[in-house]
Amino acid sequence: MILITDKKGFYITTPIYYVNDKPHIGHAYTTLATDIIARWHRINGENVFFLTGTDEHGEKIAKAALAKGKNSQEFVDEIVKEYKDAWNDLNISYDYFIRTTDKAHMDVVQ
């Protein structure tokens, strides 16, 4: 979890989760803790930006996709849906869900 605060606002992020498998209780714990902190700062009148998301590159993902008989993008799209559904079920108040396969993300990091 990263916390950055200044007079303009408060920025907080979860780890960018690696999506070689479905979300588990550890992901939920970290995201819920981050959400609680974001909500506390909002209640106190701060302009909060809460980021979460997924890291969708790497050999583990390629192997997991292959084991399921899918290409990597199809596989991560399905897993990301599970993350988003879980955060919705937990009423997580994130402002932006970043994916490392998003064009905007790839443009920035190149």
What are these regions (language model features)?
Residues M1-Q110:
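N-terminal, positively charged nucleic-acid-binding surface of large information/translation enzymes
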